[in-house]
UniProtKB/Swiss-Prot annotation:
Record-given protein name: Procathepsin L
Gene that produces this protein: CTSL
Cysteine pairs bridged by disulfides in the record: 135-178, 169-211, 269-322
Organism: Chlorocebus aethiops (Green monkey)
Subunit details: Dimer of a heavy and a light chain linked by disulfide bonds. Interacts with Long isoform of CD74/Ii chain; the interaction stabilizes the conformation of mature CTSL.
UniProt keywords, alphabetically: Cell membrane, Cytoplasmic vesicle, Disulfide bond, Hydrolase, Lysosome, Membrane, Metal-binding, Protease, Secreted, Signal, Thiol protease, Zinc, Zymogen
Residues annotated for Zn(2+) 1 binding in this entry: 122
């Protein structure tokens, strides 16, 4: 954690004796701490309780507005409840929005009409939701998700791949472990390395360690990657014809942090400043096929408690909302 945040926590903790709390939330606070294994020092407890109550109030207000038809999604308290939005962005969002390596460019199939909805989970392309923990390794989970899908397409076998292998070993390609990275750099590592180990043989630790790649346990490979033009129409055709696609999004908002269900639309979302790598596993629409009811089906890496069992429906065909089409790619196998 950034020393600035630690200092802020200590300073506010010293003043915690003057903080006032909503005592009607006491039982919920105690239950939340137990559920998420939170143990605080004497000076930190008051500060974290204040942050948690602020987040709880924001969530309740949002959901009241949702019931009035002002929002298209709900929010819920989760494991991030005692974190400020600044801490959250620093710890959880590790996509580095910088100029990537150049891959091949996706060629949209001529005269192809994409189906109205796609869900690659139903075809066996997608492993269960994973959890990156407090490590900025979202890029690794996005990359393994896309490669898992392409290996299933090639072999008919779905094998969970090692994010830890990427976190520990893809530094020479430009990735920085828990401090962030790019999916294209991960795909390049697999090609350069000649393989990637299974998750079973090289389990996730949520911290960067020395590289322990063992070719005996390699279960996947790629020959490079394909970048998709920065348009939702191109992304839609890629998802429909290729499989799950790695994308980057702007996830640095409290609304995303506490998303629960519904179609996510955040007015302040950027289509250029992306900070989080995720996996598009399909798309669809709710009720009528109007623009406001279309969504991308996105797999996150924050565990099953977050969102819709670890997934989020993100607004589709609304001017590249949150930059979902700005940095899309997939590995070639």
């Amino acid at each position: 954690m950034n020393p600035t945040f630690i200092l802020a926590a200590l300073c506010l903790g010293i003043a915690s004796a003057t903080l006032t709390f909503n005592h009607s939330l006491e039982a919920q606070w105690t239950k939340w701490k137990a559920m998420h294994n939170r143990l605080y020092g004497m000076n930190e407890e008051g500060w974290r309780r204040a942050v948690w109550e602020k987040n709880m109030k924001m969530i309740e207000l949002h959901n009241q507005e949702y019931s009035q038809g002002k929002h298209s999604f709900t929010m819920a308290m989760n494991t991030f409840g005692d974190m400020t939005s600044e801490e959250f962005r620093q710890v959880m969002n590790g996509f580095q929005n910088r100029k990537p390596r150049k891959g091949k460019v996706f060629q949209e199939p001529l005269f192809y009409e994409a189906p109205r909805s796609v869900d690659w989970r139903e075809k066996g392309y997608v492993t269960p939701v994973k959890n990156q923990g407090q490590c900025g390794s979202c890029w690794a989970f996005s990359a393994t998700g896309a490669l898992e899908g392409q290996m299933f397409r090639k072999t008919g076998k779905l094998v969970s791949l090692s994010e830890q292998n990427l976190v520990d070993c893809s530094g020479p390609q430009g990735n920085e472990g828990c401090n962030g990275g790019l999916m294209d750099y991960a795909f390049q590592y697999v090609a350069d390395n000649g393989g990637l180990d299974s998750e079973e043989s090289y389990p996730y630790e949520a911290t960067e360690e020395s590289c322990k790649y063992n070719p005996e346990y390699s279960v996947a490979n790629d020959t490079g990657f394909v970048d998709i033009p920065k348009q939702e129409k191109a992304l839609m055709k890629a998802v429909a014809t290729v499989g799950p696609i790695s994308v980057a999004i702007d996830a640095g908002h409290e609304s995303f942090m506490f998303y629960k269900e519904g179609i996510y639309f955040e007015p302040d979302c950027s289509s250029e400043d992306m900070d989080h790598g995720v996996l598009v596993v399909g798309y669809g629409f709710e009720s009528t096929e109007s623009d406001n009811s279309k969504y991308w089906l996105v797999k996150n890496s924050w565990g099953e408690e977050w969102g819709m069992g670890g997934y989020i429906k993100m607004a589709k065909d609304r001017r590249n909302h949150c930059g979902i089409a700005s940095a899309a790619s997939y590995p070639t196998v």
